[in-house]
């Protein structure tokens, strides 16, 4: 089953297809529709048609699963036990899951701190750091791992700075990502200026007592310098856990590689999530259709494929298969949000955008719940969900989805764009990116010239310097660094009300940002109900390269490094 896509394919998307998928997009979509239709011709036809219209995108693991080289799973979340046997087993499991193509996260809260009989967590994390260079994701790119640790762990202070390049190289973990599980109690201590105890999870003894505010400031300083650690508001996440899973005594102990998955882990349970994303840029085209229902069914079929095929590849998937079969959680997300707003000339950091994101995601949630209830009637409830009338414990999670967005020629995820014109660097090389809606508006004003575009790139993708551009359009095309980050957080909080999992939420601050404002924005994310914060991006203030010169002389193209996180 093949068909031509009805949206333009960029040169960058074409290069990615050629290098990683060896197929034209229409043929690839046809193959995927057949594979994940569950044997239903009508669903296969709809999936093919909706994909070719650019209404949604598959995650990279699902795209590559047609080659048979890996599993269609994006995320694996592993509990790390406090025993030598458990630590060795964790290493073995993460290696195999990485080779199977998934990103891996480890939840380290329960591993004891350093003592006369224990070296603590950092040396064990160092072995994981080495593994990521050796055990490649899907055998095509270096492995990816995120470690999560409690805000009260004795190793926390060293953990926070383990990705900074100075210090003992044997205790640095530059190949890993990391996140801190932050509790409500800690945040209240920060607000009140109280002390905070770092407590050994094994003995219960207080290892250190520190100022909560100073620890908070240290975390933010490290985020500002390196982009990490992620912040994972663990109590908020656990409040959103499905009640059936709570009744089983399960709890969330961390997030995933991209901080949007919030599922329970345990010694016998490795959380799994498969992903797909609707394209909000084309929301007006699909809003009255059954797109969301079709994608929920498709992702449930992906889960079943994993349950059926994973044990045949390695026995080290047993915990993941148990979790996937038991709760059948999926992660339907979104991309193209910035482009949708630009299409309709709505500023990203506006009250109207906050209102619209609530309306749109309320509708997506309602459709997803209808779909999982229908699947429960047709196929049965998941074993962990008996009596709740649903097939899938969790349904919605907004991932970064940069590669999926690239294939569809839209903006990634639900975040603002870094600029209206820039050099976009991905795993297939560097390409020039020009905002099509700004081009539309510049054409209408007689400003679509090489000189204007060169000035935009020279000003880090900004249009604020263009005198002939009306203020109303300058607001629409603000870069992510020109926006009020508090409005971005408020918008994310409105969206979070309708997400059973989370969202990869980035923040953007210029070099020299006010420390008080930085802290206030992060605290607002916690107070307003966001489950976590992903990267903190900083703008280094360098100018871009002449985009049209790069087009004429591709051999001289340089990569834009203006914005670093």
Curated annotation (Swiss-Prot):
GO terms for molecular function: ATP binding; ribonucleoside-diphosphate reductase activity, thioredoxin disulfide as acceptor. Belongs to the ribonucleoside diphosphate reductase large chain family. SUPFAM superfamilies: PFL-like glycyl radical enzymes (SSF51998). Transmembrane segments: none annotated. Keywords: Deoxyribonucleotide synthesis, Disulfide bond, Oxidoreductase. This is Putative ribonucleoside-diphosphate reductase large subunit. Heterotetramer composed of a homodimer of the large subunit (R1) and a homodimer of the small subunit (R2). Larger multisubunit protein complex are also active, composed of (R1)n(R2)n. It comes from the Viruses. The active site is at residues 256, 258, 260. GO terms for biological process: deoxyribonucleotide biosynthetic process. The record marks 75, 273 as: Important for hydrogen atom transfer. Ribonucleoside-diphosphate reductase holoenzyme provides the precursors necessary for viral DNA synthesis. Allows virus growth in non-dividing cells. Catalyzes the biosynthesis of deoxyribonucleotides from the corresponding ribonucleotides. The record marks 560, 563 as: Interacts with thioredoxin/glutaredoxin. It is an enzyme of class 1 (oxidoreductase). It catalyses: a 2'-deoxyribonucleoside 5'-diphosphate + [thioredoxin]-disulfide + H2O = a ribonucleoside 5'-diphosphate + [thioredoxin]-dithiol. Gene3D superfamilies: 3.20.70.20. Under complex allosteric control mediated by deoxynucleoside triphosphates and ATP binding. The type of nucleotide bound at the specificity site determines substrate preference. It seems probable that ATP makes the enzyme reduce CDP and UDP, dGTP favors ADP reduction and dTTP favors GDP reduction. The record marks 82, 112 as: Allosteric effector binding. Its EC number is 1.17.4.1. The keyword Cytoplasm does not apply. The keyword Transmembrane does not apply.
